């Protein structure tokens, strides 16, 4: 397979097509957001609470709103209000919650319910997919 070369100018041009709208949870530095943009999507907002990650994201995509709180505190109403949209109007609610507790390479069930170091915090991460499911239920993306 031949590599696909791109730069931020191309990403911006492709994103201006506005073919679909996206909010990305657990966005990190913007890997999935870049893919959506290259596919012609408009990333309206992201959620990321790790400072180094959201600062990197903001440097690459300064026009995207960043919800900087823990996803557990993010509510559908926050998204609707900030983006001036209603339930069911967003096309894609993307999320990549930490998965080490489920991974064959990770500790799997043995670590379930335990707090562990995640970036510069100590917290449970195995339950974050429930938060993603909650937001999918409440936002009701198309």
Regions found by a protein language model. Name each.
Residues 1-142:
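Conserved active-site and SAM-binding loop architecture
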């Amino acid at each position: 397979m031949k590599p696909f070369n791109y730069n931020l100018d191309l990403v911006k041009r492709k994103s201006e097509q506005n073919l679909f709208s996206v909010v990305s949870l657990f966005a990190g530095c913007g890997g999935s957001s870049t893919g959506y943009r290259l596919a012609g999507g408009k990333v309206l907002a992201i959620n990321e609470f790790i400072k180094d990650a959201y600062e990197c994201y903001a440097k690459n995509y300064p026009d995207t709103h960043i919800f900087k709180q823990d996803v557990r505190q993010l509510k559908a109403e926050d998204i609707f209000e900030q983006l001036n949209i209603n339930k069911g109007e967003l096309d894609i609610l993307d999320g990549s919650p930490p998965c080490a507790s489920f991974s064959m390479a990770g500790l799997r069930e043995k670590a379930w319910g335990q707090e562990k170091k995640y970036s510069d915090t100590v917290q449970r991460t195995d339950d974050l997919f429930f938060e993603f499911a909650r937001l999918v239920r409440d936002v009701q993306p198309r």
